[in-house]
Amino acid sequence: MKHIIYIFLLCSIFSFAQVRVVKELDSNWKFQKRKSLEAYQINFNDANWEKVNVPHDWAIYGPFDKEIDKQNVAIVQNGEEVASEKTGRTGALPHIGSAWYRNNFNIPEYETGKKVILLFEGAMSEPKVYLNGKKVGEWAYGYSYFYFDISKDIKEGENSLAVEVSNP
């Protein structure tokens, strides 16, 4: 009988367990390669922006050019005393500057008080993240995962996510 009560109690505990819900935001993104001071705003017009799915690496669009990151230096650690041409420091990425990603998504049912985490598996680089017009965080790196607690900023219904990235 003790075993039956124990199993019943375990079943009761598991029935109250929280259910984790995952919403992937890998499609329906809009993208623009340019600096914009207003792109984080909820009603920003992104109708003419390129449609992309993520993962998407904005910095590799266009031809690679070694002139972008060419240097004439002597690398002391390599024992060099005479300067010579070096390339590849940044991989000769074809775009230097800023770009934006935007995604409008729907949360059909949301209970206030639930914990909501926005997880990025990487964003190159120095992303600034906005949800519903409010900056929710930034990350100083590139191809590494990061996350923000957006529990206070998410809402039931339509939400607007904007991410500014830069390749300085």
Residue ranges and their predicted role:
Residues 6, 14, 74-76, 93:
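General helical structural elements
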